[in-house]
Amino acid sequence: MQSAPASAQGIPVAYNDTVVRQFAIMTIIWGIVGMAVGVFIAAELIWPTLNFDLPWLSYGRLRPLHTNAVIFAFGGCALFASSYYIVQRTCHVRLISDKLAAFTFWGWQLVILLAAITLPLGITQGKEYAELEWPIDLLIAVIWVVYAFVFFGTLAIRKVRHIYVANWFFAAYIITIAVLHIMNNLAIPVSLTKSYVIYSGVVDAMVEWWYGHNAVGFFLTAAFLGMMYYFVPKQAGRPIYSYRLSVVHFWALISIYMWAGPHHLHYTTLPDWAQSLGMVFSVILLAPSWGGMINGIMTLSGAWYKLRTDPILKFLIVSLSFYGMSTFEGPMMSIKTVNALSHNTDWTIGHVHSGALGW
């Protein structure tokens, strides 16, 4: 379906909703697949013989498939769909190129299929959330550059002067993920299916968790905040509670989040000052995170009655509640004394799942 509302000048605009719908459908499909794999490997922890002594069904190979499917297939398709949907409606223009938008869709599905083939076969870099080997990494980089061109190109031809705050969050996520992906995956290929990362030892660990933490921070947080800042006011039929707070939320989040990665490496050979730095910035993150949560929830001021009848608003408010809970739990678990108790326990797994599924 091609939407045709009026632009700022009153001229009808035919939005490209085809690619949005395609990504939305694949979001559902990959969500089912990713969570089904998660249920299967959880069952393997109880009944190990479920792997039937087949290496490609072993927990060690399917766990990366589960995380990649949920984060990059399920979450990624949701973000492509929502960013394309929102940027058109807040800029009052059609996507700058339908063909390039279609390329990002088919290219991203190819990446997902290649991941689904290579990970169970054990073709991996062995880096969490960055397991895919160098040919797939290159393909991701190409797709991401095209995605950035489509998004920023659409912003450049907008019919309204103002850039809505949701687009700031999407822009930050697109730029940051590009930097993280390229820097963390710098490697020397030795064959089509094998490469060696250029970093070693504790430097490799630091770069990996700079990437790993901020993949969560920008892919699963900043980008979904962009979604929140559009759909919560839209569904509530009210302006965002405090637009000024949303701008402060944006700049505080992107300034602080990048420094918090070392909290994944407490009590390791990472220098103690780096661990402490990560802890401090993680604790500071509580302020902008809760500011954003409060901003979203307070947008319903004067419209709380809609929660009784609007199922979409119910989901949005519950997701904001989970966001608040997870962003309290994360800074708390980054404190070294707390981390000494929580590290390598199911609490960490619960924290990740409450954030990913709840938010």
Give each language-model segment a name.
Residues M1-A24, T49-L57, Y196-D204, L341:
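Extramembrane terminal tails and long inter-domain/linker segments of multi-pass membrane proteins
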Residues A4-N16, A148-I163, I294:
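Cytoplasmic juxtamembrane interface segments
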Residues N16, R61-R63, Y305-R308, W347:
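Helix-boundary and loop/linker segments of multi-pass membrane transporters
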Residues R21-I123, W134-L155, N167-L192, E208-Q235, ...:
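Hydrophobic cores of alpha-helical transmembrane segments in multi-pass integral membrane proteins
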Residues E128-L132:
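Segments that form or flank anion-binding pockets
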Residues I297-R308, H343-N344:
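Alpha-helical transmembrane segments
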Residues N339-T348:
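Flexible, glycine/threonine-enriched loop-and-boundary segments that flank and lead into catalytic domains
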